[in-house]
Structures are given as structure tokens and as C-alpha cells.
Amino acid sequence: MANSLTSIRGDLPRLVDAFGAERLVLDSVSLLEMMYDNQAERRTEIFDFTRSLKEAGVTTMLTSEASESNPYASRHGIIEYLTDGVFVLQYVRSEFRETRLAIEIQKIRNANHSRETKPYEITGDGISVYQEASIF
């Protein structure tokens, strides 16, 4: 299976060009991380893959499962160091109110951004973040 990741990296520029792709979503990078038992190999392969995406010139969104021990980190703690932005999507529960969807921007490289957790919703038109609202 690891050879297929190398193959995808090799085919990526051609596929991006053939589809005229400007954006790419990979759900989930956690599956790629699980392909490698060796931590050093995992880190190298994921680094090479994310570099290939950047070189292909597409805006890329990677989803990742959170670590069980730290909900603000990816399972293997690699991807957040290789990306330009990290967004944490979570459910926020309150004893007295309904569960809300919340987004927190952990990092956006070379940009100032809010450090506040904000409510959001996903609609047929995309994602809406309620910048002026608070969670509860």
C-alpha cells in the first residue's frame, strides 16, 4: 500500500492538470499515517506527500482524527507541523443547553487570526462561522 502513496504523488500533477483542480480535500490523512508502522518513515512519507500537494498548486484541506489523549492534536502529531493552517472542529456540550458545533483556529501561517472558539454550522451552501457570536 505504501507504494500506492508514491504512485499518487507521481500522478498528482497530471491529475490536477487533467481535472483543472484548484482545490483538493483529503479525508482523512489519518488513513495515510496508518500505512506506516515506522515513525520516521511515516513522518518522511507524509512530509513528501504534503509537499507534493503544495507543488501541485492546489489549495488543500486535510482532515485528521484527533489524538485520544489530546483532542487538539492529530493522532500521530505530524500533520499540524506540515500545514499552513490548523482548524479544530468540535462538539461543545453544556448541561443546560443543546450541543453546539464549535471551531477554533489553532494556526494560520503568516496571518493574524482570532484565538476565540466560535460556533459554526454546515449548510447546503458551505460552512458558516458566526464570528460575532459566542458558544453559549
Stretch-by-stretch model annotation:
Residues M1-Y36:
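Conserved inter-motif catalytic segment of the P-loop NTP-binding fold
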Residues A2, E22, Q39-R43, S69-H76:
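Conserved phosphate/pyrophosphate-binding and hydrolysis machinery centered on Walker-type P-loop NTPases
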Residues G10, R14, T44-R51, Y81:
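Alpha-helical scaffolding segments of alpha/beta enzyme cores, especially the outer helices
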Residues P13-G20, K118-F136:
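NTP-binding/hydrolysis catalytic cores, primarily Walker-type P-loop NTPases
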Residues G20, G57-V58, T83-D84:
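Residue-level detector of structured alpha->beta connecting loops
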Residues M35-A66:
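Substrate-engagement module of ASCE P-loop NTPases
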Residues S64-D125:
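Phosphate-binding/switch region of NTP-binding enzymes
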